[in-house]
Structure formats: C-alpha cells, structure tokens
A protein has these predicted regions:
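Hydrophobic positions on the alpha1 helix immediately C-terminal to the Walker A/P-loop
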Residues: 16
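An amphipathic alpha-helix signature
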Residues: 149-157, 161, 170, 174, ...
Length: 226
C-alpha cells in the first residue's frame, strides 16, 4: 500500500511522513533526499547543474541507499557511491542546487524507476513533489500538503537551527523557497501540482500533530494499516 504525500519545500512533508509511517507501521521514502544526493554527487564531480544529460548519467550510475539507525524502524541515513550524505545534502548549497537537478528529465526518469522499485516492495509513505501524479498515480491515499511561503520559511529556519546545517537567515530561506516554488511548479517534466484525487491540506496556522492525525484517520478509513 502507498500513501503519497506531495507538496512544496518546507510544507512539513518529512516530519508528517515519518510520523504517519511510524503510527501505521509503514516504512517511509524521502524522494527529495534522492534528488539532493544526485545534486551533491554532481557538485563533487564538477558536473554543471545545467547539463541535464550528465546529471541523468549520474542518476543512472548510482543507486541511492537508505539505512536504519539502531532501534529506529524508519530509514534515516542516506548514501550515494558509498558515501554517507545524510547531513551533506541538507546544506544551503544543496538547497540552491536541487531544483535544477530535479527539473532534468533524465534524472527524474532514473530516480522514478528507483522509487517505484522501493515502494512496490512493501507498505510505504512516500513524500516528494510528484508522487501522486507521476511516481505512484495508483496510490491508495494521496495528500497534497502546503503552507504559506512565510510559514514554510520559519519552519525551515527552525529545522536548520536544530540540525546545525543549512541557512538560518530568514530572508535568505524565504527567497530560496519562493525561487524553488517557481521552478518546481513550472518545469516541463512532472511539475509540482496536486493529483486530481489528492486531499489538499493547508497547514498554515495548524499544528503538525493535527495534520498527522488527519492523514492517519484518512488512511484508517481506507483500511490502510499493518
């Protein structure tokens, strides 16, 4: 079974997806981490972020790995080419780079194939930008989660402060979110938009717990539990 959670940067997808997966006994797949990993590898290799074909070759060559920390049922460590990039892919540099990588059709083709192989192996909450529209259009439950750009910027700053990575300058983070929204929504391949049958949720002014409870209730209505 698949629960697809889509939405723009900073909407709370990661926090919500992990909590929903934990409560339902599902695993969780962060597809954004996969695109970030390709961006990181491209920068390491000196590949231009405007060279879509070269970016696609990187995605074709490398399987993105996810691993568990002791005692944690959800995969949290991310690796590519044998390197643990869990923290490295959360920097401001990757924030600025990932939308260009995700817009490359060859990258999306390669990573969507990886995502489908992973998700079809079990019960997953899958988060990203195009899960309900392109990766798993057959998902049993689709959610499109959003919030105002200002709200998302505040959340991202707080998240970066907790992690100790990424920018903590509100104006810089807000500008980056607005830039990424424009790129993600206007790209030719799998633009950011809700699936026709997605449940749309605006989390502005609502607690993350309220969103989690709503999604879990919808999942249980559909008999989605282990």
């Amino acid at each position: 079974m698949i629960i697809a959670i889509d939405g723009p940067s900073g909407a709370g997808k990661s926090t919500v997806s992990k909590a929903v997966a934990r409560r339902l006994g599902f695993s969780c797949l962060d597809t954004g981490a996969m695109y970030r990993s390709i961006a990181w590898q491209a920068l390491q290799d000196g590949v231009s972020l405007e060279d879509g074909e070269a970016l696609g070759r990187i995605a074709d060559m490398h399987e993105i790995g996810f691993s568990h920390e002791p005692g944690d049922p959800l995969p949290r460590r991310v690796s590519i080419a044998g390197a643990d990039v869990t923290d490295a892919i959360r920097t401001a540099e990757i924030d600025r780079s990932v939308s260009a990588v995700a817009a490359a059709p060859a990258v999306r083709q390669a990573l969507v194939a990886q995502q489908q192989r992973i998700g079809r192996a079990g019960n997953y909450v899958v988060e990203g930008r195009d899960i309900g529209t392109a990766v798993f259009p057959e998902a049993e439950l689709k959610v499109f989660l959003t919030a105002s750009a200002a709200e998302r910027a505040h959340r991202r700053v707080a998240q970066n402060e907790r992690r100790g990575v990424g920018s903590t300058d509100y104006a810089e983070v807000l500008a980056d979110i607005e830039r990424r929204d424009a790129i993600d929504s206007s790209r030719d391949t799998s633009p950011l938009k809700p699936a026709p049958d997605a449940v749309q949720m605006d989390s502005t002014g609502r607690t993350i717990e309220q969103i989690i409870e709503r999604i879990c209730a919808l999942a249980q209505e559909k008999g989605m539990h282990v």
